[in-house]
Amino acid sequence: MTDLPAVRGRLTPNRDLSDLTWLRVGGPADYLFQPADLEDLQEFLRNLPADMDVFPMGVGSNLIVRDGGLRSVVIRLGRGFNGIEVDGDTVTAGAAALDAHVARKSAEAGVDLTFLRTIPGSIGGAVRMNAGCYGSYVADVFMSAQVVLRDGSLATLSAEDLQFKYRQTELAPGAVLVSATLRGPKGDPDALAARMEDQLRKRDETQPTKERSAGSTFRNPAGFSSTGKADDVMDLKAWKVIDNAGLRGATLGGAQMSEKHSNFMINAGGATAADLEGLGENVRKKVYADSGIWLEWEIMRVGDPKRS
């Protein structure tokens, strides 16, 4: 076993990751590191052998870890990284702060980040993936982010550094985003709270919120960045082309395309990562055969298949 740097947080070898993903699948990581604080994270990365891969992991809301696990040090931020501070119309949130919590606390202070309320996951993942909903994206409200680079140094990144695109950014490999500062328009707290309640109601009516899912499985075919027309208002939707191909409710093993929303893949019971990824690939092929459109995964898939 490789000698790793001493830490004040928790460092666990051969840590199964299935309980850390919303789909409850996946094999073990070589190591899981949960740093105590920023300095602990910096010191660890500074002294970690350069040939060891690092994979920053949020709350696992948009992730399939393959059944063979990850040959990496997985870094998962916790309580030391979930603070939320509001100053005027700016909000600084730790990467581990849940999107919903950021939206609520911002609204209480009269700052409109309500689009974050129904986005699963944490701010770190939301920034990394340029998450969006209701025609708004993180890129629209982003000011800056602090990241710890692979060598342990701390850097402040601008929107230009991250190069926001539709559902992606250009973040250096091994870099761990630790906080982000956002700026939203001012609004009446009661009106913002009411809007979020309406958003939650609509979400619960249309999405399988009681099932184990990872949010949208595929990107909408005509995905624009937030500098163009938002994909949320495009007519062509991933769920529509999936429906047109007759794949609502399609299954493979314990994996299923939800009957409630056909662009949501669920673990209907006992699914493996191979079931979920295999079903997704089946859907992609059949949609292409039906419509000529190759759907792109929105769920991140990482790791190795299980060895037979």
Curated annotation (Swiss-Prot):
Compartment(s) where it occurs, according to its Swiss-Prot or TrEMBL record: Cytoplasm
Gene Ontology CC, one term: cytosol
Pathway the protein contributes to: Cell wall biogenesis; peptidoglycan biosynthesis
Keywords of this entry: Cell cycle, Cell division, Cell shape, Cell wall biogenesis/degradation, Cytoplasm, FAD, Flavoprotein, NADP, Oxidoreductase, Peptidoglycan synthesis
Name this protein carries in UniProt: UDP-N-acetylenolpyruvoylglucosamine reductase
Entry EC no(s): 1.3.1.98
Single GO BP term: cell wall organization
Catalytic residue positions: R167, S216 (proton donor), E298
Pfam families (UniProt xref): FAD_binding_4, MurB_C
Biased composition regions of type Basic and acidic residues, renumbered to the chain: 198-213
